[in-house]
């Protein structure tokens, strides 16, 4: 049976650090989106003469759309931060059913390829760094195909997941 990187056991404090990394990534994303929004607004306001602005309504409309999209991106990132503010994943015994907050390792039944992921309410696809050099973890949400497949399962269960049109069989080899 495979274990998480470096045979580590993820503790409550470690998961708190993983959540902290997620928060920092979302905060960085929000700041970048707000900066991009401000740059678009500045360019729309100062980048053309009044005559050019009147003649090119299409460019003004595009700038407005980009500004709104960046504002939405920032709002979405801050909503994720709000969600994580109350997210307190605890340590799970190896026999626990998988739920949000679990650290899960799965292994491909055909080739033995393993993946370790952190099941979180937000942050799909983000990469987190394990505390103390315990390796990297990808964030999976419960709405993703793999998230849906593993919810409620236990160590040793086998799940089928469709990846790029192919059904793959994965065995759960660690829950923590």
Locations of regions flagged by a protein language model:
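Sparse recognition of residues in long alpha-helices and their boundaries
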Residues: 42, 49, 86, 171-172
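C-terminal structured interaction module
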Residues: 153, 157, 170-175
């Amino acid at each position: 049976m495979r274990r998480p990187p470096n045979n580590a056991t993820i503790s409550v404090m470690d998961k708190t650090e993983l959540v902290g990394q997620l928060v920092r990534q979302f905060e960085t994303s929000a700041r970048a989106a707000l900066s991009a929004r401000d740059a678009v607004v500045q360019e729309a306001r100062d980048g053309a003469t009044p005559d050019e602005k009147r003649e090119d309504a299409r460019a003004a409309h595009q700038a407005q759309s980009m500004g709104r999209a960046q504002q939405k991106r920032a709002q979405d990132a801050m909503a994720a931060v709000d969600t994580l503010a109350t997210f307190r994943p605890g340590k799970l015994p190896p026999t626990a059913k998988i739920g949000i907050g679990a650290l899960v390792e799965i292994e491909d039944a055909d080739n033995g390829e393993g993946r370790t992921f952190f099941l979180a309410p937000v942050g799909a696809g983000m990469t987190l760094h394990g505390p103390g050099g315990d390796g990297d973890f990808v964030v999976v949400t419960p709405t993703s195909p793999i998230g849906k497949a593993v919810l409620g399962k236990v160590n040793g269960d086998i799940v089928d997941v469709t990846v790029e049109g192919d059904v793959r069989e994965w065995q759960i080899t660690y829950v923590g």
